Amino acid sequence: MSTVTITDLARENVRNLTPYQSARRLGGNGDVWLNANEYPTAVEFQLTQQTLNRYPECQPKAVIENYAQYAGVKPEQVLVSRGADEGIELLIRAFCEPGKDSILYCPPTYGMYSVSAETIGVECRTVPTLDNWQLDLQGISDKLDGVKVVYVCSPNNPTGQLINPQDFRTLLELTRGKAIVVADEAYIEFCPQASLAGWLTEYPHLAILRTLSKAFALAGLRCGFTLANEEVINLLMKVIAPYPLSTPVADIAAQALSPQGIVAMRERVAQIIAEREYLIAALKEIPCVEQVFDSETNYILARFKASSAVFKSLWDQGIILRDQNKQPSLSGCLRITVGTREESQRVIDALRAEQV
């Protein structure tokens, strides 16, 4: 009689799953962490809620109302979750039948769309972006049959550019009555004029993902949002955990979304954008850098002459970047988070010392 192992008992798709390689999971012993698009310094908050003996609200009122006011939507159009990553998964769980429906996304892009779908047993379809990293609308149209959720990251991680708004409109018309279109706006604070939040009334099948991890400098808090019409939010409420936000998380999130919290966030954004432009200008003058791509975010994508050697050399010096070589159309590319001026200078000096 053959022995059944614990792994044998697991679902086949989980046995075969490659987990998302987060920046922390990839490790490294650096002192300059520029691989996770975090804000470089900690923001201090004081906990005001001491009722830790009680379960929290499922959707904390202060957080929802503050975020709705900030985003320019109604409170009924906001769902708060454990990071935007939970929002990605909730949309698949609410709208996709495992073994029947599919999601669609456009690489090179964020890796959690596929991991969430594969974990649940939902097929992934990909339509690579065009050479300018814009949507291949014809390719998407050809693959839409059976697709229930389409994920589009804008500005796109890791390329840093915005998706053409007219292409978004075309996609929303293509999918009307067929699929949910999810605009992942994790980095929208760095280009707020490009948000699609004002489109929700026009498109009942539009959902928007947001986070406090980037411009709000709260990656350790794990707090994200889904903006959508009330019908979508009500469906997501059926599949979300009963207490997604702990009391301390809700407490800090509400403070971060207060009027003074929003002002502080915008000051951070202005500082990061200024630092980004400084770093882009410096990178363009460095011999081992082949190309620096424009960015609307808090990170820069650049192509290097010997990216693997450069990545390892900086890693050995304690400067941790994100290797994008395995992504479609990104051979030779590394992604650099915009940090402090001191961190930028460390990167610049290390790259200038590279042999070409």
From Swiss-Prot:
Positions of modified residues (N6-(pyridoxal phosphate)lysine): K214
Superkingdom per UniProt: Bacteria
Organism for this UniProt entry: Shigella boydii serotype 18 (strain CDC 3083-94 / BS512)
Binding partners and assembly: Homodimer.
CDD domains in alphabetical order: AAT_like
Substrates-to-products reaction catalysed: L-histidinol phosphate + 2-oxoglutarate = 3-(imidazol-4-yl)-2-oxopropyl phosphate + L-glutamate
Keyword list, A-Z: Amino-acid biosynthesis, Aminotransferase, Histidine biosynthesis, Pyridoxal phosphate, Transferase
Annotated family: Belongs to the class-II pyridoxal-phosphate-dependent aminotransferase family. Histidinol-phosphate aminotransferase subfamily.
Cofactor: pyridoxal 5'-phosphate
EC number: 2.6.1.9
This protein's pathway: Amino-acid biosynthesis; L-histidine biosynthesis; L-histidine from 5-phospho-alpha-D-ribose 1-diphosphate: step 7/9
GO molecular function, one term: pyridoxal phosphate binding
Protein name per its UniProtKB record: Histidinol-phosphate aminotransferase
Database matches in PANTHER family: HISTIDINOL-PHOSPHATE AMINOTRANSFERASE, HISTIDINOL-PHOSPHATE AMINOTRANSFERASE-RELATED
Signal sequence annotation: none
Record GO biological process: L-histidine biosynthetic process
Enzymatic class: transferase
Gene name linked to the record: hisC
